[in-house]
Every structure is written in C-alpha cells, then in structure tokens.
Amino acid sequence: FTDFSLYGDEAQYWLWSQNLDLGYYSKPPLLAWFLGGYSGLFGDSFISLKTFPLIVYFFISYAIYKLCLNLSFDKKNAKLCALNFLIIPAASLSSFLISTDLLLLLFWTISMVLLLKVIKTNSTLNFFLLGLVLGLGFLSKYAAIYFLLSLLLLLFLDRTSLKSVRNNPL
C-alpha cells in the first residue's frame, strides 16, 4: 500500500522478532518477543507494524488513568490526565515509532500503580504482581533499573512505605 519503510532501529527490532532469542547485542528481548507474536497474528505489513505502538500507547494511557485513580483523582480528572498523555507532543509523535521505550513506559506506569496499591493495602498479590511487572520492565529496557533505585530511595525516605513492604509476608 505504501512506499514508506521502517526506520533503522525499527527494522532491527523487526528482524529480531523473526529470530527470537533470550537477548540481543544492546537490548533485552521483550520487544522482539512482543513483535514476533504481534506479527504472527496481524502480519508484517508496514501498516500492521505501525499500529503496534499505537495499541501500546492506549494501554499506557489506561495505566495512567488507573495511576491517577490510585492517586485519588476523580474519574473525570483521571480521564483528562490519560487523554493529555496521548496528545502531548512527545507521546503523540513517538506513538508511531516502534521502540523499547514503549514497553518500558507501559510497565513502569503499571509498576507505579501496583506500588501505590502495595503501600495502601499491603496486599501480597500486588507485591507479587509488582515484582512480575518490574521483571517485564527489565526485559523491555535495562533502564528499568532506575525504577528499582527510586523504590529503594522511597523506602529509605518514607517510613510508611518501608513499613508496608516490611510487613508483607512475601
């Protein structure tokens, strides 16, 4: 349908998705795994591949909505916050690019939602899910280590958060 093609990094990620592995030269494997599954379902056409980041951005927007609700926003303002994310220039322009940042942002946001739930409810299930989602974050981009460092700083500075984590039986 079009003469457009993937950018260099996007083509590299797509090639990785054709040869799945446990890791690649400079990146963890999760984006390639997701693209491989996505391509298997929807094909390898340019239009199909370019809709992948759009779908992920809508999941990120929903995670932002849930994060805002956990931060005590009302539903209307949480929806506005999620919508604002979709229309800010950085997000709206990058929503057409296949990159490791997509999945990192998704799992980072979900991790924040789960962290708030752990602090508020001290739920073992949410604590387990937080670890799982953080693991997915690390499999999407190594920069997820900064979430863990921020979490350690939070636990050091905020006694309530530390108490919630310490009291968790997991």
Label the predicted regions.
Residues 90-104:
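Short acidic/glycine- and proline-prone juxtamembrane loop motifs at membrane-interface regions
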